[in-house]
Amino acid sequence: MISPLAYIHPEAKIGENVEIGPFVFIDKNVVIGDNNTIMPNANILYGSRIGNGNTIFPGAVIGAIPQDLKFRGEETTAEIGDNNTIRENVTINRGTAAKGKTIVGSNNLLMEGVHVAHDAIIGSGCIIGNATKMAGEIIIDDNAIISGAVLMHQFCRVGGYVMVQGGSRFSKDIPPYIIAGREPIAYAGINIVGLRRRGFSNELIENIHNTYRIIYQNGMNLSLIHISEPTRRS
């Protein structure tokens, strides 16, 4: 159902079984897939690409121009995958000439007031807490949990299966599988609960723990270490 009070540009492409509430604004050069729900007062702006099965709550703004003074109106996009929940007042900016696109994967929950800046990449299966702000060109790998009111500096990367504690702020990368928190942010152990929920065996979790013990006790620099996703065994 499409509300007669919504505005949809004639050049926008809308898939099948899409529910669009009153006072929704959908700009030109927008592509929206099937089975999406877009609630009242959401704005889907120029260059947005929305996959299938997403739920977009009131006040969300997707595809606004980047907050970057170097932006000169380049043809860039904000790309959203499938089955995401994007809550109230979330803002997802378009990319810049640097990378051309801002990407949010699939099966993510972005809670109220989250900001995703230009050229950011968020993987799949992530949870981003209320009022968390992510600067330009950050990367969040799959299955990470970023708690509420976290401030993430430009160019930082958060590894997969990480838990970042609420209210943290950081300007350096966070390696995978750990809990990070405190002020200044620091390693706070392995994300054991999160790893078990994702099917990691006790043996594998212990191997990850031992790896980080070696890294941190020897003062090693993570830039010299390659950490790949392990093969999980039941």
Positions of PLM-derived features:
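Structural signal for interior beta-strand "rungs" in well-ordered beta-sheet cores
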Residues: 2-181, 185-186
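Single conserved hydrophobic/aromatic residue that forms the stacking wall/gate
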Residues: 118, 226-234
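SDR active-site lid
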Residues: 184-202
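An accessory alpha-helical subdomain
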Residues: 197-224, 228
